[in-house]
């Protein structure tokens, strides 16, 4: 835009003055035409309509009615009621008021981003505060704060103000004598710098107000650093001299590039060399125009690196992070000429990866160098990125900031919360291109793909033909077309495909310099794209079936070292994962997670057909076989199918042992006792028909058998000796001890053995003098509550045990059993009924 400036010129020649006025009028006319042309191609923005509405003045209209109508038009242009809903209009009004009440130092930064909602404005402010906090934590030392290599020609620091101030100096005026900064200066708020523009002018403005003893430096080629005079006093004379030499060298580099005039340069060098305590000065007016040099494009890339340097004003002695100095040294050695196709950025010399921002390039370089500058103060673990250290520190603090809105479960990392959401939604975005199976987690897909590779390796021949390589190259090109971002990477890696020896193996894991990522060959998830920087790589051993990690105890081998570590806990008995609620420990984290659902009551796996919920996914899979009728586990001996593996295991025991239950009538032998009972009922029914006995007892026995069958279906754990079934395996184990007479639990007082742990506690109460359970009727005390309940039947007259034959009632079960034996001697059918009832 052409700017006109008024000048006071004393001239006695009228024609010259007239021509000057005509020239000014011509310039203004051209400016108006340029504005009209720009408005056609650059329509007013939301901020423009807002400013028109807020800055409208009454005198701009001819009268009150026109002023009101004009305001209505401007308000409609701002709020756009024909496009926005009432909620959106209210949001705009709230946003306008929110921007008004913001502190003055935040308002220009937020308005520069043009937020369209209150949430966007809040996000901008939070980002500013977060960067401020990070920069305060990254303290740098005073003398070494600006390393020599940092003074690159393009590294120019932006101004602290969102709108840089430019002070034009008249060429005919002599340079003014610079003034020293006042000793009493307020610290200037360090806010994140706005992106540099091509036409932005560099300034070295010095701010000084207030009462605190602080001196502010605006570095031209480096960063803005604030020093307290007390901090400067901690430095010795050699350190002060070193800093002045660095300053001279930096300004010399800038002058050589044309960023500073020679007069101003000599003046600044003289000021830096001054031995007084006020070491830093700057001219009040300095003209700095940015030359159109190609190296100046490097400034925006160095912005992320420059922002990492900051001095903490609350600390007396400054510190320097050595890794930051090495990072800056590495940055200055990188030239923008290394980029391909004229792009600005940095390319890694080890793996060829390209980065636009210098900060991302620095983080990537630590992968090759193995540097881990961020160390945990609690356990000493080190990390190559600060975000990883922050996530690790939450393990010590117990902080879990990411909470699920559905079940309330909290997580330390946001990615874990995203994975957890798929449990509620049932979404499985990661699909296998080979078999079409979907998975909820990327790691599960990787493990599944390894199985395909092992299967293919067994089917492939030993030939190393070119057709195999060409087919893989073709598949890589197909996926490179699906994702243009990977095209360059795929072309680089196609030439690095290794020999496909036994099993079509491929170099899946990048050896820091070469290799093909697995996902470039097998594809990506079905419903969303994955970040290729986070894709793990399949090692060559997964396709060949090699298991290099071997257990020294039992000789078992594993593909991954993590699986070996988990396996070794079985031998060592180590259980590092402990439940905070009940104190139980587990050797794997997944087992602890499943156990914690017992306390929380969480059942994330729901059956879509009947709505029944389960704590473990495998239980849901077993339950779904009830609806489908599928019985995948079949017996090789008799061909019988089962819905659960445990049922098949119990069935196989029947084939492995002898038939021990024999019928006395016909001599037939049975595996299970309940089968013998069913068979004997048939014999009793035949006898009843011959003798003409009432069929009521016979039908009652059949009912008992049918009830027993239903019971067995719901209770999968069955005793091989007596046929009794249980719903839980632990109950079956305790029941086996009644047959084997095993008593593994011993009393510490009398050394008596008992079969169950609960019986041990009950037994030990005999030796305790306290009888906590007392009868209210007679005052008698008992050690066990069950004994008290039996005693109270004497007072109440309760007789809960009834004989089904004669209807006689008894107070105790032992009395009922004695009574039933009298019926056994008279009626053989009742013998079977008693046995059936006991079962």
UniProtKB/Swiss-Prot annotation:
Pfam families: KRAB (PF01352), SCAN (PF02023), zf-C2H2 (PF00096)
Ranges annotated as C2H2-type zinc finger: 346-368, 374-396, 402-424, 430-452, 549-571, 577-599, 605-627, 633-655, 661-683, 717-739, 745-763, 773-795, 801-823
This protein's name: Zinc finger protein with KRAB and SCAN domains 5
Subcellular location: Nucleus
GO BP of this protein: regulation of DNA-templated transcription; regulation of transcription by RNA polymerase II
Organism in which the protein naturally occurs: Homo sapiens
Function (record text): May be involved in transcriptional regulation.
Domain of life, source organism: Eukaryota
Name of the encoding gene: ZKSCAN5
